[in-house]
Swiss-Prot record:
The keyword NADP applies. The lineage of its organism: Bacteria, Pseudomonadati, Pseudomonadota, Gammaproteobacteria, Enterobacterales. This is 1-deoxy-D-xylulose 5-phosphate reductoisomerase. The gene is dxr. InterPro entries: DXP_reductoisomerase, DXP_reductoisomerase_C, DXP_reductoisomerase_N, DXPR_C, DXPR_C_sf, NAD(P)-bd_dom_sf. Homodimer. One of its GO terms (molecular function) is 1-deoxy-D-xylulose-5-phosphate reductoisomerase activity.
Amino acid sequence: MKKITILGSTGSIGINALSIIQKNPDLFKVIALVANKNFSIMLRQCELFSPDWVAMRDEKSAHILRKKLKHSKINTQVLTGEKDICALAALEETDHVISAIVGMAGLLPTLSAIHAGKTILLANKESLITSGYFFMKALSSSGAKIIPIDSEHNAIFQVLPLEIQKNLGKTTLEKNSIKHLVLTGSGGPFYKFSSSDLSNVTPDQACSHPNWLMGKKISVDSATMMNKGLEYAEARWLFNALESEIKILIHPESIIHSMVQYYDGSLLAQLSVPDIRTSISYAMSWPDRICTEVDYLNFYKINNLTFFEPDFTQFPCLKLAIDAFSQGQASMTVLNAANEIAVSSFLDSKISFTKIYEINMEILMSSCFSEPKCIQDILEIDRKVRILAKNKVSSLIF
């Protein structure tokens, strides 16, 4: 039985992971759950899964949860704050940690789990793209393992040789007869929109993905295709891939989740209906597979599968992320922080959709940071850039 801690249990990934655990109680046991401040969902999760521990980042929410658990006579211990969250990520009794906290808030807890030698089921891409060198170095020295949850990286993982699966980031693609990886992306809800149309889209429109049910932040990132740029960076680190070894392809139907081109001419792909439970369940059960309630792919109902090259003019955030990766970890940290503030401001209706790119570009172009020498340097860059980005948003409002 695998003993699980979920970082970000009240979000989309966490809720879906718990639904898989609920269907497979003989395979998984929940040891600890972590969330930000959604105490009502956390209360329900405690009632259903009886974790030994939970941690809420928000102290007020933790206080409310303690009262409600006591009233319900549930013995789960409630902790609060980042220090306690990191402690739960490294619990001795846990062997698998699902890293699903959104954004840079997931960095330190994920690193804590890595240093403790856990198997990390990674959905929090921000922790890897901003601190890839330190992340992979810690992974190597601790003996921890990493399995990606993102549908694209999970799809690639599924069709890789076992040698790479067991040693992500430690071996080259070329040594395993791989010519390149193909990251697919739907193009989001706006891939047919004109530039003038994009300036008027609403947060609700941006969060209405045609194929996937996701959280708000990642939905907006999908709409700008920043998400694909971040996934490009994630793939570079995870699979130790060179720039020439990654291709990006727009695939609006979201049936082929990614592909691996081998030197012998074989192109291996992972196909399924667009349901994140497929990749979550594979990550949780690897190297085995388990039954899920995901519908099977029916080829008779698929009219056609289409593919396009990405248009960097229409999706400049994608190009911005690819270029930032080539500039180093400081640039990726700057871009990630600026984007988190810009997306949050758009969701709060403070800025227009097209301003997301403008803010990202201006902050990235105007920032000049030395390459980080440690995690603390990355956190400091992140802190300073968030201030710059918030000031930029304020200047656009007033």
